[in-house]
């Protein structure tokens, strides 16, 4: 797909800037699915680099902000297994970490029964979609029925704390994560992340916000859109470049490269769909069922 190719190239360009830009003692950058807000200390050269990065990432649906991640695993990184990840069938509210593989015949049968409940319809137009229609990125003021909301810590750091291991925090804070180890479900690799290389890990909206908009969220209240954008059920910290390749694709067009996790991914997509009464396309539902067959 053209959008996936463009996002992949843009993410590559942004990564080059982050890797080779001049060092800086302190920075705080947030990318909000197509918009970059930057606070810098340490020189105009890096400021220019950050502006370039925002331009490179603009328009890529599903990209989480650089401040949310970092340190993507290098080629040949150790296999992650599932770490502390929970089976999504046993994690219906998304408050437990990660996505564990669904492997048993009994669990696959449960998964298919869940996916069968998902309604289908054609994908509507993207007209009028803007990220801000779902609230500003990673707000802590989502409706109170959303887990982790209004706890004094923004959504992205809540998710890094949920899924990360060996956490380190900014001095004087129990919210802002500065380094962690992540068992990435999408690639099956272990990522040693630091905030100084933030763009390498992103927070994925499993059911992308643009997809939500096209499937009915355009008619929702603002509160309901803010809920799905910040609900931990719909959010997973993952390898940044891999997430960049997803764009706003449904399961018929994109699945995690780690095949053993695909049934779990399909289940999580279905859980979000059912909770928010959002249909999926018929090809997406067929692909979801296929991942949990056998």
Q: What does each model-identified segment do?
A:
Residues 61-64:
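Bacterial signal peptide processing site
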Residues 12-36:
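Short, Lys/Arg-enriched N-terminal segments with co-localized hydrophobic residues
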Residues 177, 185-294:
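Domain-level detector of nuclease and nuclease-like folds
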Residues 57-59:
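C-terminal motif of bacterial Sec signal peptides marking the signal peptidase cleavage site
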Residues 35-47:
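Bacterial N-terminal signal peptides that target proteins for export
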Residues 120-202, 206-207:
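Secreted/periplasmic proteins that engage bacterial cell-wall peptidoglycan
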Residues 71, 76-147:
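N-terminal module-boundary/linker segments of secreted carbohydrate-active enzymes
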């Amino acid at each position: 797909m053209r959008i996936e190719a463009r996002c992949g190239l843009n993410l590559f360009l942004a990564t080059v800037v982050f890797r080779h830009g001049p060092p800086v003692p302190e920075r705080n950058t947030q990318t909000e699915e197509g918009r970059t807000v930057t606070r810098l200390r340490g020189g105009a050269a890096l400021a220019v680099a950050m502006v370039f990065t925002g331009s490179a990432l603009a328009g890529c649906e599903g990209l989480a902000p650089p401040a949310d991640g970092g340190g993507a695993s290098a080629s040949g990184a150790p296999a992650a297994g599932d770490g502390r990840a929970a089976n999504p069938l046993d994690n219906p509210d998304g408050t437990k970490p990660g996505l564990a593989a669904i492997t048993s015949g009994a669990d696959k049968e449960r998964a298919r029964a869940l996916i069968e409940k998902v309604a289908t319809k054609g994908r509507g137009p993207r007209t009028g979609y803007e990220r801000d229609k779902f609230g500003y990125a990673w707000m802590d003021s989502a409706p109170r029925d959303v887990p982790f909301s209004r706890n004094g810590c923004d959504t992205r750091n809540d998710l890094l704390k949920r899924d990360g291991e060996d956490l380190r925090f900014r001095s004087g804070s129990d919210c802002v994560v500065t380094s962690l180890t992540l068992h990435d479900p999408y690639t099956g690799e272990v990522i040693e992340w630091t905030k100084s290389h933030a763009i390498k890990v992103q927070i994925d909206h499993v059911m992308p916000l643009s997809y939500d908009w096209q499937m009915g969220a355009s008619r929702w209240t603002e509160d309901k859109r803010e809920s799905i954008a910040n609900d931990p059920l719909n959010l997973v910290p993952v390898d940044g470049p891999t997430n960049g390749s997803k764009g706003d694709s449904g399961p018929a067009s994109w699945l995690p490269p780690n095949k053993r996790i695909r049934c779990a991914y399909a289940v999580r997509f279905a859980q979000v769909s059912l909770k928010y009464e959002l249909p999926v396309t018929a090809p997406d539902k067929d692909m979801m069922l296929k991942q949990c067959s056998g």
